[in-house]
Structure formats: C-alpha cells, structure tokens
Amino acid sequence: MNERKIGILLSYLNIALHAIVGFLYVPILLHYIGKSEYGLYQLIGSLIAYFSIMDFGLTAAVTRFYTKYKALKDKVGMENILAISLYGYGGATALSLLVGIVCYWNLDGIFGASMTVGELLEARQMFLLLLFNIAVSLSTMVFRSVINAHEKFLFLKGLETVQLILQPALVILILQKYPTAMAVAVAQTALNVGLILARMYYCFAWLHISIRFHYWNQELFHDFKKLALSVFVVTLIDQVFWKTNQIILGIVRGTAAVAVYSIASLIYMNYMALSTAISGVYLPHITEMVAQRRPIEDLSSLFIQIGRWQYYLLALVATGFIIFGKQFIHLWAGNGFEDSYWITILIILPFTIDLIQNIGLAILQAMNRYDFRAKIYLLTGVLNLVLAIPLGIKFGGIGCAVATGFSMLMGNGIVMNYFYKKYIGLDIPAFWKQIGQITISVGLCLLIGYGLDRMLPGSGKIAFLCKIFGYTVLYGVIVYGIAMKSEEKEKVQGIARKFRRNG
C-alpha cells in the first residue's frame, strides 16, 4: 500500500478519532469548566485563530515548489526554496507577534461590554499563551510542508493520531486540579511544542533535508508570491467563515451564544474533514501530473472520480444529521443547544458543493491559478461579513449561519463552477450530471430513513445508536445497488475481501 493510500486511511482514522474524542470531550469540558468558561475558551480560540493565517500562504507554496524541484531531481532548487521560505516564515512570525501585542492591549475595549472582570483577566492570560503557541507553530511550519511534499503520510498523520489521543487525556488530567479554560490552553500548547520538535527531528534525521541559500530567482519569486498570497487570501476568508461569526456573537450576544454556535462549529468542521481527508493528500500527486503536462481530461476524470466518493460519504452524514441531528445534540451537549441543529443544517448543505469539488482547489494550486479562487473568496467573505453582522444582531447564531450559507452557495458554488468550466476546462456538466444521478438514491434514503425514525419507538442512547447503524446499512445498500458504477463496486468488493482475509 502506497503512502497516499495510507495517508487517506489514517486521515479517516483521525477523523473518526476526532469525532469520537470531540463528542466525548465537549461534555467533559462543559462538566468541569461550565458553559461560560467553555464559551470563553472558544471565543479566545476563535480570535487567536486569525494569527494562524499569518504564514501568508507559504505552506502551500513551499509544498508545491518543493514537490516540483523534487520531481525534477533538482537538489539545489530544493535546498534553495527551503532557505527562502525560512526568511518568509521569520517575517510572518514577527508580524504575528506585533499584531498580537496590539490586540492584547485592546481586549478590554473589544469584550468589556460582554465579559465580567474575571473573564477579561483570564482572556488576557489565554491570549498571550495561545499567541506564543501560534508563533512557535508559524516559525517551524516549513517542516510540515517538507514531510507532506515527500508524501510521508504515515509519520505526518500518525503524529496527528498521537495528538488526538494525548491532548484530551492531558487536558482531563490537568482539569482534575485546575478546572479552568486556561488549563486547557496550557495543555494544548505543551503538546504542540512536543510535536513540532518531533517533526523537526524527522526532517533532519530521516529525510536528510538540507536548507541552504544558493541564488535569487526573480521568476521563481514571482510565481511563489502569486501562489502564497492567493492561498493567504483564501485562508483569511476561511477565518471569516469559520471564526468571525463566533466573535460577532461574542460581542453582541455574549459567551453563551458563542458556546451554542461552537457546538455547531464542531460538527460542521468534522463534516469538512471528511472531504479534505482525500483531497489533502493529492496536492503532490496533482503537481506532478501538471509538471508532466498530462492532458486536462485526466485531471477532469480525477476531479469527477474523487468527487463521487466524497459525495457518497458526505451525503450519508448530511442526511443522517437531518434525520437524527436534534436527538444527537440533545444526547451529546444537553439542553440549551437546540439552535445548534439549525445552524449546522444551514451551513453544511451549501458547503457540500465546495467539499465535493475540493480536488479542484489542488488543481488550481498545481497550475498556479489559485489567484481567481482568492478573488472570488474575498468577495464572498465580504458578503458574509456584511450579512452576518445585522443578521447576528437580530437573529443570533441562526442569522450568522444564514449569512455564511448563502455566501458559500453564491461564491463557492455558482461562481467557482463557472470558472472551473470556462477557464480550467474541467467537465463540470458531466460532474453535476453524475452527482444528480447519485442524489436520486440519496433522496430515497432520506425519505425512508425519516419515515422509519418517526415510526420506530425509543429515544435513549441505545435506541439512537441502533437507528444510526440501521440507517447507515440502509444507505449503503441503496447507494451500492442503485448509484455506484461497476468499477466503484469492484473497489468496495476489494476492500471487503481484504477485511475478510485480515479477519
């Protein structure tokens, strides 16, 4: 099994672990630190997350150009691009610290109206610690890019598995004595520093990388800057979508509203990870395809093929959440989080369009055409911000979700599909024809599943798990029998045979 397949499998293992740990972890956090402290932790985390984008797209650019030189067996180019990127990361780290200090001195003015004196004091302490965490991460991000470019996904994803298991265990251990949001931040920072040291050791001891400045290439710098800034703009707008709504709610509604929105956020971020688990390991492969000048038909075929598999999985989760989501949130988070269901629905449905097409983003990066995505995403983010503020004031979290869902539908859906077809040459009509055919089976599953849920008695945890299992089997049978192509069925059968042999 090659590293790419291992990377995909480990990504899904990590998603499952993240979901399981998260769904167990959040009630434990709420139990130890309470709703307000949890909301405070999410609020400061949302604010500090903006500093993580200050790599200015360097990570994606390093992966792309390092992979290109690696494919061409240009050792000097590989060493040179790492040296240049380290200067960039150093500047990004310094800038993030400068901006962070300015924000720190203005925290009282931003949140003074919605926080108590005690909450503000703890918020300042958490902000400084998490700012340090971000600075350490930014200055060493190049090592993650190198491991990704070498497609060493067993190590890269394995570290993520370790983090998923150790972090909640460490947090719970600390909360026994110090039940505060600050204690959670301390545990996260300590573990993050340890993992960074492990990645650095792997790069030098196992990959034997060398970082050395050889020459200045103006054309390379122009291409590098174009991709890096494009990725930076997209990452910035990602923060608008996924973090700004919580900050708006923190200002106009307080920490309790942030906690409700954060429950929905945890669900739709796990939903997003189901898609990016596949596309995230394909950038080096697609970069090699583009470098080898493979025809656009090959890229279009890959775009449709991966999109179908992503849709099979995402449609299962989306329809399952529509049917069972209210009961799930009640069993998981308890009372007071009813709006989280509608917030999640309003976001994941339009978001699905973008998620089943995110191989297209890797294609744009490999072609260095990502600047259009950045421009459209910028306009989409502005639209989201303009809509989210008044809707958040009037309707709370649901209003913010409406703004985000509508903005994604317009920008990530309609406009990006036009660009893929018109300027990249991907066969978008064929893509949507195939997705439409699958949707017939998905709709049938939704109707049958909803009817069975209404008819079958039981609302406890055991009954809930049985319904989830039953719906998953129903979905699998219908989609396999009606929607899947023969070659897709053969892949499923091949996986089943491997499981039987291993069993």
Language model features by range: what are they?
Residues 4-5, 134-160, 172, 179-182, ...:
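Membrane-interface junctions at transmembrane-helix termini in multi-pass inner-membrane proteins
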Residues 3-68, 96-103, 133, 167-168, ...:
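Signature of the first transmembrane helix
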Residues 56-72, 149, 207-208, 264, ...:
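Helix-loop junctions and terminal segments of transmembrane helices
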Residues 35, 104-129, 321-352, 424:
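Interfacial segments at transmembrane-helix termini and the short loops linking adjacent helices
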Residues 1-4, 121, 181-182, 199-242, ...:
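Interhelical loop/hinge segments that connect adjacent transmembrane helices in multipass membrane
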Residues 426-427, 449-503:
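Membrane-proximal transmembrane or re-entrant/amphipathic helices at the cytosolic face
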Residues 28-32, 36-37, 154, 165-197, ...:
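Membrane-interface helix-loop junctions in multi-pass transport and translocation proteins
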Residues 6-22, 187-199, 203, 218-288, ...:
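Transmembrane helical elements of multi-pass membrane transporters/channels
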